[in-house]
């Protein structure tokens, strides 16, 4: 939930200079007199401070006025709004700062003699956070730039390789198709005239030789008796 109430004021109160044996019940009894509470949180490491959150910012302001400098949990506490000063518009004059008290403790480290905005631990945390944020931002920018460059290089290197491989495949397939079609046409459909003539001659020659061998030999004239005719010799004249 928001730390600001419906009237726009601060609802969380800082309680400083608490003893090590401060209890949650004592704080609730002391601050609930001014209004209903939301949460009560007591620091343990380092100890010495607490935060009390009200439901209404006006109750928080009343608690600051009534309990600041009072003895709670066996020690004189310092009570103020968690921002250190009440919320104001930009046209209001900044209120006068509270005079420094050497007995006040810092709620960041628990030591006396300074406040949280002057704490060396708080300054270190702010520096480490700013450095980590700047480092992460620069790292993210470098990573995004290197990634975009690598993508551009990959796309450039991949496109000529793909185009070359595709052109080589197409040329090879076209040459194979041409060679196959040429061999089929030459073997089946397109024969040279010299081959056809030689085949026709080789086929016709044995037929002529067979016809000659089968043709009957010249017939000899025979007599009806079967013996060859002889010319009659002239009869002798006795």
Swiss-Prot record:
The modification N6-acetyllysine is found at residue 24. Required for pre-mRNA splicing. Can also modulate alternative splicing in vitro. Represses the splicing of MAPT/Tau exon 10. May function as export adapter involved in mRNA nuclear export such as of histone H2A. Binds mRNA which is thought to be transferred to the NXF1-NXT1 heterodimer for export (TAP/NXF1 pathway); enhances NXF1-NXT1 RNA-binding activity. RNA-binding is semi-sequence specific. Pfam families: RRM_1. Keywords: Acetylation, Cytoplasm, Isopeptide bond, Metal-binding, mRNA processing, mRNA splicing, mRNA transport, Nucleus, Phosphoprotein, Repeat, Repressor, RNA-binding, Transport, Ubl conjugation, Zinc, Zinc-finger. The gene is SRSF7. It comes from the Eukaryota. Found in large molecular weight complexes containing CCNL1 and the p110 isoforms of either CDC2L1 or CDC2L2. Interacts with CCNL2 and CPSF6. Interacts with NXF1. Interacts with YTHDC1. Brain, liver, kidney and lung. Belongs to the splicing factor SR family. The keyword Secreted does not apply. GO terms for molecular function: mRNA binding; protein domain specific binding; RNA binding; zinc ion binding. A zinc finger (CCHC-type) spans 104-120. This is Serine/arginine-rich splicing factor 7. The modification Phosphoserine is found at residues 32, 163, 165, 167, 181, 183, 192, 194, 196, 231, 233.
């Amino acid at each position: 939930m928001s730390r600001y109430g419906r009237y726009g004021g601060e609802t969380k109160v800082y309680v400083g200079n608490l003893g090590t044996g401060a209890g949650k019940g004592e704080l609730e009894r002391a601050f609930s007199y001014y209004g209903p509470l939301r949460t009560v949180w007591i620091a343990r490491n380092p100890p010495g401070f607490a935060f009390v959150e009200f439901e209404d910012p006006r109750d928080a302001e009343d608690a600051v006025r009534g309990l600041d400098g009072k003895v709670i949990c066996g020690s004189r506490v310092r009570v103020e709004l968690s921002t250190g000063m009440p919320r104001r518009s930009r046209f209001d004059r900044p209120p006068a700062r509270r005079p420094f008290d050497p007995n006040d403790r810092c709620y960041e480290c628990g030591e006396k003699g300074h406040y949280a905005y002057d704490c060396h631990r708080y300054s270190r945390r702010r520096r480490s956070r700013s450095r980590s944020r700047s480092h992460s931002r620069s790292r993210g920018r470098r990573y995004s730039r290197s990634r975009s460059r690598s993508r551009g290089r990959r796309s450039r290197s991949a496109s000529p390789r793909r185009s070359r491989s595709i052109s080589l495949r197409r040329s090879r397939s076209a040459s194979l198709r041409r060679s196959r079609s040429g061999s089929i046409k030459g073997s089946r459909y397109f024969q040279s005239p010299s081959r056809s003539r030689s085949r026709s001659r080789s086929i016709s020659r044995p037929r002529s030789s067979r016809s000659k061998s089968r043709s009957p030999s010249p017939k000899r004239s025979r007599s009806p008796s079967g013996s060859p005719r002889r010319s009659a010799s002239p009869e002798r004249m006795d």
